[in-house]
Amino acid sequence: MAAERTQNLQDTFLNHVRKSKTPLTIFLVNGVKLQGVVTWFDNFCVLLRRDGHSQLVYKHAISTIMPGHPVQLFDPTDEVASEKA
């Protein structure tokens, strides 16, 4: 039996928007608005790319992340199946 690795919601979200190249608006705690696509992230920072330029943003400075379009992280049919079991 293979061990199932669980990811936290933050990593799941960032990985999804990175892979799908979803455009984001990121608001920092000081009110600054950044826009771009996540190209890389780790436990401490996010690399945001826009118009050929990259910005390294520390996660502790991020207040809110808004994707440009709705993001579905989990399959709702899986939840229905697990509730019936």
Curated annotation (Swiss-Prot):
Domain of life: Bacteria
Keyword RNA-binding tagged: yes
Pfam families: Hfq (PF17209)
UniProtKB keywords: RNA-binding, Stress response
First and last residue of the signal peptide: none
GO cellular component terms listed in the entry, alphabetical order: cytosol
Cysteines paired by S-S bonds: none
Domain Sm: residue ranges: 11-71
Molecular function terms from GO: RNA binding
InterPro entries: Hfq, LSM_dom_sf, Sm
Family to which the UniProt record says this protein belongs: Belongs to the Hfq family.
Record HAMAP family: Hfq (MF_00436)
Job of this protein: RNA chaperone that binds small regulatory RNA (sRNAs) and mRNAs to facilitate mRNA translational regulation in response to envelope stress, environmental stress and changes in metabolite concentrations. Also binds with high specificity to tRNAs. Seems to be involved in the regulation of NifA.
Protein name, as recorded: RNA-binding protein Hfq
Species of the source: Azorhizobium caulinodans (strain ATCC 43989 / DSM 5975 / JCM 20966 / LMG 6465 / NBRC 14845 / NCIMB 13405 / ORS 571)
Taxonomic lineage of the native organism: Bacteria, Pseudomonadati, Pseudomonadota, Alphaproteobacteria, Hyphomicrobiales
